[in-house]
Amino acid sequence: MTTTEGLLMIPRLLLGGMLSLSLFVTGCSALRVSTSEQNSKPVEVGLRDSAQATPEPTEKAIPDGMEEVAVTLGEECPISVEFAIDRRWGDGVGYSGYWLYSNGDARLISVNCYAWGGTQPQDVTDEAMDVTFSESGSRVVSEKVGETPGGVFWTVQGVLGPSEVRSIASTESVLYGAVAGIRDDGRLYKVSVEMVAKSDDAEAAAVYAQMLPTVRFAGNALTPPPGLN
């Protein structure tokens, strides 16, 4: 297991305990096709917008019934993270570099940030694109790749197969996410927001579709995937 994989598994291992704490306190355009170089990966077909000239993203208004949160990630991460959140997801729990919001045990929003060992911001998003939807039954529905001050971002809407590490209770799940590689004071960081729910939870998916376009990293808005406003 690589260092990066180990870091990514830490939140998963602590998830059960953190959910219990949260419940106690509160009462959490081109086709992209991946083929046969890695036989274990499924064929993925989705709408992708990766034009060279990225229009300046515009900040989205906070949807009705939501409020903007500024996630404090401690010493692990100097990159600010803000987005609108439905109040039903509570105040969240976490530790330096990681924060988790939940609405029950099957509607999760995780925020991650840590120093990245590579050298190029694009390496961060390239790896995320390779591994996030890598198991059978997973697919990208819509995605956007672009530049942000100090780095590169990837926003995505997709479906996670039951065997994906991010899936809910080993069932097919939806994911709405934003990942970026951003330099700060000469150091490269990976920062992400991932919103996950079971694929039959249409209500949560509709909420996530409103939240994702409001995500900002380091104070900068990100362009959402095609189809999300």
State where each predicted segment sits.
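Low-complexity segments enriched in small/polar residues
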Residues: 72-78, 94, 125-136, 149-150, ...
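N-terminal targeting sequences that direct proteins away from the cytosol to non-cytosolic compartments
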Residues: 2-100, 196-229
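Signature of long, low-cysteine stretches enriched in small and polar/charged residues
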Residues: 133-184, 226-227
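Generic recognition of long tandem-repeat/solenoid scaffolds
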Residues: 98-104, 154-156
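A short acidic-to-branched-hydrophobic micro-motif
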Residues: 101-127
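A generic structural motif
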Residues: 115-119, 195-200
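Short, well-ordered beta-strand elements
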Residues: 186-197
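Short, solvent-exposed coil/turn segments at beta-strand boundaries
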Residues: 84-88, 102-106, 149, 182-188
